């Protein structure tokens, strides 16, 4: 997990947070690159804001702990001014709260500074629902063919992301963390893919995706892209792992082909699982989704009588 962003922050705050991360890693190895990666990123955002807003304050100083409820309210307001949803705000608050809970357990502080002291975020039905789209086969083919024709607007990674999300039904965290060494091109899958809750699965892909991956491998060779991450972004002259934000932006761009302004990778996952259910039944769909029970699949991943379908 890269922590270079922390280098310019107050040393004492960084040290205690790194100690916390190391502790988490020892007991949560399976989810270190998924759940705790999100916690880490959320806490880094808070640390940057905290230093900019409160200068040389220490995270565990007496005055900081006393003022923490007000500090958290200020941070909430800051996040809302950036357009963060209530759900995102809750996740960011949780990342900070778990850090302070750990500090209490390790006797670094005597009490949690804002537990049960903040007003609860009130969620309406509008807050709870993010638009989900169950795409049709026609829509899937439309995007595929449009990218093929408009090859200057959409690169190989756009095309592979589209096919791979729909073929594998994997979550964005799993797709983002794919590495070249996991690829079994001949047999059509990435092996040892880490999914939510520590599940280790194979991410399968089919013929069209296989052809695009062959092109991508050739392109990487010709252009000297010698990094292990499968999906990459160029920063200056250096290729690095593509971020989840960049992947979301690419999928959102592809959604615009269909006139959908808020298409997310999770809608592609839902589409894939829904299509499998229609073809082969709920049991196989649930298994392919790596769900612990078919109830989760049925409730959240299968198109109802009147789905949002364009």
Annotate the PLM regions.
Residues 137-172:
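Basic, Lys/Arg- and aromatic-enriched nucleic-acid-binding interface segment
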Residues 194-196, 289-310:
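Catalytic-site neighborhood detector that most strongly recognizes the C-terminal catalytic loop/helix
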Residues 163, 167, 269-291:
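C-terminal catalytic core of tyrosine-transesterase DNA break-rejoin enzymes
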Residues 168, 172-173, 177-211:
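Conserved tyrosine-mediated DNA breakage-rejoining catalytic core shared by Y-recombinases
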Residues 195-215, 227-250:
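C-terminal catalytic core of Y-nucleophile DNA break-rejoin enzymes
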Residues 16-130:
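N-terminal core-binding DNA-recognition domain of tyrosine recombinases/integrases
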Residues 183-185, 261-262, 279-300:
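Short, polar N-cap/turn motifs at the start of nucleic acid-interacting alpha helices
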Residues 124-142, 197-208, 224-228:
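DNA breakage-rejoining catalytic core of tyrosine-based enzymes
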